[in-house]
Regions:
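Acidic catalytic motifs of isoprenoid enzymes
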Residues: 1-220
């Protein structure tokens, strides 16, 4: 698990390995599950119908689970079978990541991953059409703000803390906006533009700064 985590993101690997036992496995599970579906959404060789279908299949496979002990890995194997040669290891091993977390919190991670996969499928069906800032708010919540809410729940489960959830949403939106800025040229090359109409880098930078500023207490 740690090897794949390090290969996938050195940025997230370092803070995750410093977490105490139990929380470390939960956060690693959440990160790898989310990264697994993110790789589907951004896959350069799949068209949007294939992306949407795969994400919906993942969502349904996770919705059908009951516990870590009875987790049906075959459901995900079947979801990936038509595209397994095209998908990265972090995606095809999603079932392994799903059962990394302690059994008491793992279903919360499945629920979050399932919901996010469903939202990603919806946006893929729409061709990731972002017309207004309201569209951008909806997209950044669906694929990132909700991650902040999940992390709040993981901390709440482990420490009995209740972080401010509105800060978590802003933090996720801000990070996603930074990703959109960084990947803008690559996204355009594959026919996707996450910028609202009339926006350039200046407006997206301002959006990212505003969201990150509103979340300062969360990141502290």
């Amino acid at each position: 698990m740690l090897k794949i985590l390090e290969q996938t993101s050195r940025t997230f690997y370092l803070p995750i390995i410093r977490l105490p036992g139990g929380l470390q496995e939960a956060v690693a599970s959440a990160y790898l599950c989310m990264r697994a579906i993110d790789e589907i959404e951004d896959h350069p060789e799949l068209d949007r119908q294939q992306i949407s279908s795969l994400l919906q299949s993942v969502s349904l496979a996770l919705q059908g689970q009951h516990s870590v002990e009875t987790f049906r890995h075959q459901d995900l194997t079947e979801a990936f079978q038509d595209n397994v040669s095209q998908l990265p290891e972090v995606t095809t091993r999603l079932g392994e990541w799903a059962v990394l977390a302690p059994s008491a919190i793992a279903p919360r991670i499945w629920e979050a991953t399932s919901a996010m996969a469903e939202r990603m499928a919806l946006w893929a069906n729409r061709g990731w059409t972002i017309i207004s800032q309201s569209d951008l708010d909806r997209y950044t919540f669906g694929v990132a703000g909700a991650v902040g809410l999940l992390l709040c729940d993981l901390w709440g489960w482990f420490e009995g803390l209740q972080p401010e959830r509105s800060h978590a949403i802003s933090f996720g939106r801000g990070l996603q906006a930074v990703n959109i800025l960084r990947n803008h040229k690559d996204d355009l090359a594959r026919g996707v533009d996450f910028y609202p109409r009339g926006w350039g880098d200046k407006e997206m930078e301002a959006y990212a700064r505003q969201k990150l500023s509103a979340s300062e207490n969360y990141s502290d």
